[in-house]
Amino acid sequence: MITRETLKSLPANVQAPPYDIDGIKPGIVHFGVGNFFRAHEAFYVEQILEHAPDWAIVGVGLTGSDRSKKKAEEFKAQDCLYSLTETAPSGKSTVRVMGALRDYLLAPADPEAVLKHLVDPAIRIVSMTITEGGYNINETTGAFDLENAAVKADLQNPEKPSTVFGYVVEALRRRRDAGGKAFTVMSCDNLRHNGNVARKAFLGYAKARDPELAKWIEENATFPNGMVDRITPTVSAEIAKKLNAASGLDDDLPLVAEDFHQWVLEDRFANGRPPLEKAGVQLVDDVTDWEHVKIRMLNAGHITLCFPGILVGYENVDDAIEDKDLRGNLENYLNKDVIPTLKAPPGMTLEGYRDSVISRFSNKAMSDQTLRIASDGCSKIQVFWTETVRRAIECKRDLSRIAFGIASYLEMLRGRDEKGGTYESSEPTYGEAQKKLAKADDFESALKLPAFDGWRDLDTSELDQKVIALRKVIREKGVKAAIPA
């Protein structure tokens, strides 16, 4: 296994940390030490520790599950070191040992140890990757859910927390009472305006606990928004074995990620920050324009490729993008429907971003399932396609490619590809009646599905007729016959 001792004798093809591993100190506490965090935030911090050694990371796991206990044991055995293999679309890989994570605590085993770190003045940022659903926002009301059982328990016994909200707010309470400074609360989850979501969640909890404390947090802590991006696949036992064989390491915690990585972060920090710009982080006043580019090109591009790709019979994204017809349709969608109606952020060319999207989809080492990308298509269409569709209708642009995308989505919901294969399409927001509507031969009624609510207030008559016509072509002649010229 990898340890501080084995750092002295790494294989020649493996990069060691470029700093004194014994000379770095924590400046960040991070909740939710998953693969994405280890390949993203920790990756950026890794690169600045040589210049700023007081910004290492203490990781915290919140659950006491057997899996969490095993992870804690593995981190401890390896001195929190692990390998990261970065793989380019060409197949070329680089391997480095990561040392930015200096400690890992399992919160249920020692809650006070976690609070001790959080209260330490040396900790100036508390970050998290707790998933989109982890912020405990009620989907109906849009407010922090105070009915959550774990939240209720923390509010009843706030000095002995179990949730991330309880830990962070209790730590800020102790800092305030000691006359100390607040820290920055930094979400690194892959959701729009993640800082605003975090702010709503933590202040929602704090207000329920103590309105005066909530006011102090609101005035002293900051919650910067950030846009994060890097494909980091799950590492199975088989993949771990292959990674170790290629690197020559004996690593119980290996990671693999694409060579592409991006982090655009609002420069709003309450108590100092590491020089992340030296590692390539783009520090900006507002991340909105970058979020729009990612949503309308990368995320929308994914489903634009996968809906028809599934119908043709492709199971993996990298195989679908190699199909010249599907690739051509995606390129036309980006070039003709998205780029002309999208604002490029400073320092970015939309054409360059388009090329990176196509390249990333073709990376076989990052292969992803088309069905996974297409799952919950209703929600994804609402978020990823709506702005482009609205612009096209309002500006009276050609609707053919958009109609083809919608027709492909509706045909995909039938669960049968052109080769006769069957599959299960996942639409968790649809009830039984909506699922039947999607699979019925009544093409017009299917356009009433909630996936298309984002542009229902506009005149959609032309778009609707094109969708109906293209569904007929797909049924009679196949997907490729329906692809617009």
Swiss-Prot record:
<comment type="similarity">
    <text>Belongs to the mannitol dehydrogenase family.</text>
</comment>
<dbReference type="InterPro" id="IPR050988">
    <property type="entry name" value="Mannitol_DH/Oxidoreductase"/>
</dbReference>
<dbReference type="GO" id="GO:0005737">
    <property type="term" value="C:cytoplasm"/>
</dbReference>
<dbReference type="InterPro" id="IPR013118">
    <property type="entry name" value="Mannitol_DH_C"/>
</dbReference>
<dbReference type="Pfam" id="PF01232">
    <property type="entry name" value="Mannitol_dh"/>
</dbReference>
<keyword id="KW-0521">NADP</keyword>
<keyword id="KW-0963">Cytoplasm</keyword>
<keyword id="KW-0560">Oxidoreductase</keyword>
<dbReference type="InterPro" id="IPR036291">
    <property type="entry name" value="NAD(P)-bd_dom_sf"/>
</dbReference>
<dbReference type="InterPro" id="IPR008927">
    <property type="entry name" value="6-PGluconate_DH-like_C_sf"/>
</dbReference>
<dbReference type="InterPro" id="IPR013131">
    <property type="entry name" value="Mannitol_DH_N"/>
</dbReference>
<dbReference type="InterPro" id="IPR000669">
    <property type="entry name" value="Mannitol_DH"/>
</dbReference>
<protein>
    <recommendedName>
        <fullName>Polyol:NADP oxidoreductase</fullName>
        <ecNumber>1.1.1.-</ecNumber>
    </recommendedName>
</protein>
<dbReference type="GO" id="GO:0016616">
    <property type="term" value="F:oxidoreductase activity, acting on the CH-OH group of donors, NAD or NADP as acceptor"/>
</dbReference>
<dbReference type="InterPro" id="IPR013328">
    <property type="entry name" value="6PGD_dom2"/>
</dbReference>
<dbReference type="Pfam" id="PF08125">
    <property type="entry name" value="Mannitol_dh_C"/>
</dbReference>
